[in-house]
A protein has these predicted regions:
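Surface-exposed peri-terminal alpha-helical interaction modules
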Residues: 1-126
Length: 126
């Protein structure tokens, strides 16, 4: 049986530690109260929550994609190619996540969507 490949690490972590800010929790840092209140279905149909969450998550991924693309452009202009490459690699991974998100959405059939589509008004593309 082989040993864990990380067991004999050459990295000295003796001066590393977990840095805790006692004044802020994980939920506070991420502003989870606000984020989790942003899903407001217009109907009582079960699948509308899926529709909302998938689209909100996609918007957040796209926001991060733009943030990384701008950072990469700034790094390129500064001649920092390795940082730009890292950021562009991150953009590619974000795009992979966006594509994978559709695998969840396709579990909702067109008939499922049609049940609450009228409740979305003009936001539904109608």
């Amino acid at each position: 049986m082989s040993q864990c490949p990380y067991q004999a690490s050459q990295v000295d972590l003796s001066d590393e530690g977990v840095h805790w800010d006692q004044d802020i929790s994980y939920g506070q840092y991420l502003d989870l109260d606000a984020v989790l209140k942003c899903q407001n279905p217009r109907s009582d149909k079960h699948d509308e929550m899926l529709f909302i969450v998938i689209h909100q998550v996609s918007e957040l991924w796209m926001k991060l994609c733009l943030h990384e693309a701008h950072g990469a452009a700034n790094s390129l202009m500064a001649g920092n190619l390795s940082t730009a490459f890292k950021m562009l690699t991150r953009v590619a991974r974000i795009q992979e996540q966006l594509i994978k998100a559709w695998e969840v959405l396709v579990t909702m059939t067109p008939a499922d969507y049609a049940i609450f589509r009228d409740d979305l008004g003009q936001s539904s593309g109608s």
